[in-house]
Amino acid sequence: MSRVGKRIIQIPSGTEVKIDGSFFEVKGKLGSLSRLFSPFVNIKHENNQISVERLNELKPTKQLHGTTNALIANMVKGVSEGFKKELKIEGVGYKATLKGQNLELAAGYSHPVSLVIPKDLKVEVPKPVNIIISGIDKQVVGEFAAKVRGVRPPSVYSGKGIQYKDEKLRRKEGKKASK
């Protein structure tokens, strides 16, 4: 059984927390995030620590307990440190460029694919084959990174495509010539 819900979240210095019932808001040096949580979990803030307690022992409440704790931990980390995803592009002629608020990808199609960058994200293209996506909301960063990767997922045969920098690809062998 998971014990995620019982973890105590430390609040770093320079981070402000405001709790109003089931509404949770956190402000830090990188920005602010707020979220409305379930009324079946109780969020407590004391001595620069946040703890989450469930109000009953029903199965849905137990499930929300750990989820709420993890979401709050991600919010606190996001406004203090931020989140970052790095992608790399492999393949001849595959490249990325920034054009205003759009990320343009040449990924082997007859046309370039243009993706609108969400307003709370920062996207950098240090080299045409590297993309760095950063922001304070872990969900938005991960969603946009998955959207970029989904334009041309890496091929298991050739390895060409867009992949996360730390992703290990499982390669397959090609067809054998018949005798």
Swiss-Prot record:
Domain of life, per lineage: Bacteria
GO cellular component terms, A-Z: cytosolic large ribosomal subunit
GO biological process, alphabetically ordered: cytoplasmic translation
The keyword Ribosomal protein appears for this protein: yes
GO molecular function: rRNA binding; structural constituent of ribosome
Keywords: Ribonucleoprotein, Ribosomal protein, RNA-binding, rRNA-binding
SUPFAM superfamilies per record: Ribosomal protein L6
Quaternary structure annotation from Swiss-Prot or TrEMBL: Part of the 50S ribosomal subunit.
Summary of the function given for this chain in its UniProt record: This protein binds to the 23S rRNA, and is important in its secondary structure. It is located near the subunit interface in the base of the L7/L12 stalk, and near the tRNA binding site of the peptidyltransferase center.
Family: Belongs to the universal ribosomal protein uL6 family.
PANTHER family for this protein: 60S/50S RIBOSOMAL PROTEIN L6/L9, LARGE RIBOSOMAL SUBUNIT PROTEIN UL6M
Protein name stated in the entry: Large ribosomal subunit protein uL6
Native source species: Mycoplasmopsis pulmonis (strain UAB CTIP)
